[in-house]
Amino acid sequence: MVDVAFVCLGNICRSPMAEAIMRQRLKDRNIHDIKVHSRGTGSWNLGEPPHEGTQKILNKHNIPFDGMISELFEATDDFDYIVAMDQSNVDNIKFINPNLKGQLFKLLEFSNMEESDVPDPYYTNNFEGVYDMVLSSCDNLIDYIVKDANLKEG
């Protein structure tokens, strides 16, 4: 079993959206050896459910997010793969845990998009655009993890 964590600032918009989408894609692909989490690098939303914009877009696409609440990325977290939404969160992750053992990426490294950072829809209100960015990256990320961790699909 490998652990993957998506990380954004408050863990109410981008990273829970990515967690829910990734879980759905893993289910669709019948992959059971990847456990998905999400975390935030800021503590002001701890214990809150996903933002209503995130909930709305996930509901629109019939992707479950039951029981998800905001959690903080901590130095003691031990994930195999850490996937940040933007460079600011990469920097925050390295500051919180300068001795990371897991592999650290930005999500859009797994997309075919020119952008390198997933913009925060908390400020832009573009939840649909963020959904498209996350969805376009998840299968390539899954492919990478399956190969890197020598997992079986199906």
From Swiss-Prot:
The subcellular location is: Secreted
Similarity field: Belongs to the low molecular weight phosphotyrosine protein phosphatase family.
Tell me which residues this entry annotates as catalytic. 8 (nucleophile), 14, 120 (proton donor)
**Gene Ontology MF term list:** protein tyrosine phosphatase activity
Against InterPro entries, the record matches this protein to: LMW_PTPase, Ptyr_pPase, Ptyr_pPase_sf, Tyr_phospatase_low_mol_wt
The protein depicted here goes by the name Low molecular weight protein-tyrosine-phosphatase PtpA
A GO CC annotation recorded here is:
extracellular region
Note the Gene3D superfamilies from the entry: 3.40.50.2300
- Disulfide-bonded cysteine pairs: these are none
Q: So what does this one do? A: Secreted tyrosine phosphatase that plays a critical role during infection as a bacterial effector protein that counteracts host defenses. Required for intramacrophage survival.
Entry PTM: Phosphorylations at Tyr-122 and Tyr-123 are essential for phosphatase activity.
Asked whether the UniProt record includes Secreted among its keywords, one would answer yes
Chief subcellular site? secreted
What catalytic activity does the UniProt entry give for this protein?
A: O-phospho-L-tyrosyl-[protein] + H2O = L-tyrosyl-[protein] + phosphate
So what EC number does this one have?
A: 3.1.3.48
Spell out the subunit comment: Interacts with host CORO1A.
Instruction: Enumerate the UniProt keywords alphabetically.
Output: Hydrolase, Phosphoprotein, Protein phosphatase, Secreted
Q: Which domain of life is it from?
A: Bacteria
